[in-house]
Each structure stands twice: as C-alpha cells, then as structure tokens.
A protein has these predicted regions:
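PLP-dependent amino-acid enzyme catalytic core
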Residues: 1-193
C-alpha cells in the first residue's frame, strides 16, 4: 500500500482522493457513508452491550456519522430502550444542522479535527435520524477540559475527537446522572499546545 497524507481536513483529503480516482482509476471506499463500513463499526455497539448489558445510554462522536450509525443500529437491535447521543463540536455541526434544520456556521480549526466534517453522509444522515435520540454540541474549551481530565485523572491520552463524549458528560452531568453510560474514547493523535 502507498499511504499519502494530503489535506488538513477530511474535505481537503477527499478532494485529493477524487483527483487520484480520476487519474488512476482507483476505487473509493468511503470512510463513513458506506454500508459495509457502518456494519463494521456496529461491532463496537455489540461489544459495549456484551461487556455492560445494563447500559442506559451511549455517547458517540459524530463526524460524517459512520461510527454512530453502526453503533446505534447494533445497540438498539439488542436493547431498543437504550438512548444514543451524538456529539459534535460547535465549529463543525454538520449533522446537527441536517437533523435539526439549522444553519449554524461550519468554520475554523478545531481540536477535534477527527470529526471536523462539513458535509454529513446521506446514508448516515438517514440512519441517525431514525436511531439517535439527540445530538449535543460541545465547544473547544469543553473539549480541552475533557482531554485534560482524561489525562490527569485516568492517564488516558485522547485526541479531541475521542474526548467529545467526556466533554458532553462534563457539560451536562444532570442529563446522565444515575445512568449507566458508555462512550468511545479513542485516538492519541494529539499535539501539545
């Protein structure tokens, strides 16, 4: 395999990929708007509920929506009463805008660059509309606090996109009070500021 790193955002990278596909006749496996990718990511939902069968809710980052789509389908298939909350950064609320018919600005850089997606998926948008209970937006300061808390309290190094679930819990503790809650914490792809 030939790995090429190109672009600061997913959108910039996708523009480069489209050019390469035209030039070289390559096949695109979409990173989130693909049924097989969503199906694979659903195994995380199964693992959550096999490990902790009495979960009341899951809090999942949203970029293009593949991860939360797979997890939501799997989790609600096992436990239809489980609540699924999606988390986006206030700087990139693309899926939030789509589902809530809002026009919040999508702009700037974010510490949660792993979920900095300007255009949500069509397949994922439909799934999220049917399976996700709500989307919570978190700001940069809230994400930074979550990253710090994860490191200081648990010695977990998480990138911004991986810490947004914890940011949502810290932002809205009353929403999750008394609930068995799970979140995905991932990625050590973070630079010191």
């Amino acid at each position: 395999a030939n790995v090429i790193l190109k672009g600061r955002t997913l959108d910039e990278s996708q523009s480069f990929v489209k050019e390469k596909i035209k030039e070289e006749g390559l096949t695109l496996i979409h990173p989130y708007d693909n049924h097989n990718v969503i199906l694979g990511q659903g195994t995380i939902g199964i693992e959550f509920l096999e490990s902790i069968p009495d979960l009341d809710c899951l809090i999942i980052p949203i970029g293009g929506g593949g991860l939360i789509s797979g997890i939501a389908i799997a989790a609600k298939s096992i436990n239809p009463k489980i609540k699924i909350y999606g988390i986006q950064t206030k700087k990139f609320p693309a899926m939030y805008n789509l589902l809530k018919n809002k026009q919040l600005n999508i702009t700037g850089d974010t510490i949660a660059d792993g979920i900095a997606v300007k255009i949500p998926g069509e397949i994922t948008g439909s799934i999220i509309r049917n399976y996700v209970d709500d989307i919570i937006l978190v700001n940069e300061f809230e994400i930074e606090k979550a990253i710090s808390s994860l490191f200081e309290n648990d010695r977990v190094v998480s990138e911004g996109a991986g810490a947004v679930g914890v940011a949502a819990i810290m932002k809205s503790p009353d929403l999750f009070q008394g609930l068995n809650t799970g979140t995905v914490i991932c990625g050590g792809n973070i630079d010191a500021r």
